[in-house]
Amino acid sequence: MAIKSSIHIKPCNTKSSEAHNRRTAEYMRNIGESRIYIVPELSADNEQWINPDFGNSNLQTHYDNIKRMVKEKTGRAMQEKERERKGKNGKIIKVAGCSPIREGVLLIKPDTTLADVKKFGEECQRRWGITPLQIFLHKDEGHWLNGQPDAEDKESFQVGEKWFKPNYHAHIVFGWRSEEHTSELQSH
């Protein structure tokens, strides 16, 4: 049965995305003792999938390889920054920069599986030609409640003495280009 959800896709911050998604030791140290929105005891419930075609490079290396390939194939540098130009009517038009790696956050339910999200990624690839490179299910994020939850709140639960309201979601990192059409990187 299909369920409704939402996803917000934007250019991926390749320098910090993997640290957050993989919960690296350095990332966990940097968010500090307060663990504002992550409960480490719940991190074992997180799941991940890396597209076998992606290989074992990290996102920044992959991004740098794309930049180099664009330069080799087109003779020009990849246009990364947003820029403005004047239209025929004299109005200023913003032109988006190229973002070959993008990340979307998909809202999920507590019982959503990695297979469910992979199926969603496959549908995105079929419909729009965007390739899922990495998928991370996060079931350890949320926020602490002040006191007990409302009676109709069925998701919050107790961790020690405090009540926690989970924010179940999945991060999907998409490749937004094809090897054959490097000069036609999608920028919208």
Language model: regions and residue ranges:
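Short "domain-exit" segments at the C-terminal end of structured domains
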Residues: 184-188
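N-terminal nicking endonuclease/strand-transfer module with a His-rich metal-binding environment
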Residues: 1-183
